[in-house]
Amino acid sequence: MISKTEITRDWLPRYTGTQIEEFGKYILLTNFSNYVSKFAERFGCKIKGKGCPLQTSTNDSGLSIINFGMGSANAATIMDLLTACNPKGVLFLGKCGGLKQSAEIGRYILPIAAIRGEGTSNDYLPPEVPALPSFKLHKFVSDTLLE
C-alpha cells in the first residue's frame, strides 16, 4: 500500500510545479496570486506552477510563498502536502475579520487566535478550542514588525 509520505512527495510537485528540494525551509501561505507576484518581484525570483493549481516562488534566503487558493479544504491539503518538504515554519498571509475602526489600510495585523467555524478542523480539535499560532513564530513575527 502506498504511504502518506509517498503521496505527498508525488502530489506537492504535481500541484505546484516545484520540486521538493526547491522549497525553502520557511513557507508563506496566501490565497492571493498578486502576493506571489509581489514576492517574486521583490526578491528577483521566478514564479513556478503558473499552469498548476498552486503557484510558488522561493527566494535565495530559503523563504517560499505558495498561493493555495481558497477554503479550508485547500488549506488542509497544502499543509498535508508540505510534510513532504518538512518546513521549519509556515505563516499564513491573508484576511482578518473583526477588526476595530482604528485599523487603517496598510497596517499589519497579527492575530492571537482564530475562531474555527469552517468545520474541517473539528476532526483535530473540538470547535470551542480556538486556533492558536505557534508561540515562537508569533513572537518572531511580532518582534520583526516592531523593528
Where are these regions (language model features)?
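Metabolite-binding pocket within alpha/beta catalytic cores that recognizes anionic/polar moieties
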Residues: 1-140, 144
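Short catalytic/ligand-gating loop segments at beta-alpha or beta-beta junctions
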Residues: 147
